[in-house]
């Protein structure tokens, strides 16, 4: 039981373009819910918050999303990861409220109590995960802005260790 599906968002980093509407219409015609976004960077950060704050923890702890909501220690870890990511996102494009981000991530965890993430599955199955693309992106952007992200750095190292352990 993976976490869930959602709508596909398409956009250009430089703003909107009339070229994207036909693309979204084609996705929708194929049964894939799709919308265009005039501010795709904010959409990317919004998606990244849940992936970096919750998905990475499901892999490290080897638990479903609901555990992050229900366990006080796991929830505190999620909050710290969400706050770090929010600080980086605000340096990048501004306008995110850390407490709202935490609440949104917690809602995702609460609403999918038995949901497992792709990072969890990759680690469990001994495959290389997408942690470098997700949490690694936060670390890279944090470095550009001079923002410390110790929770992200630790989670990435833990997942790499688990990947190695489960491949051997």
Regions found by a protein language model. Give the residues of each.
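NAD(P)-dependent Rossmann-like dehydrogenase/reductase catalytic/cofactor-binding core
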Residues: 28-29, 79-168
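Internal alpha-helical scaffold of NAD(P)-dependent oxidoreductase catalytic cores
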Residues: 1-52, 57-98
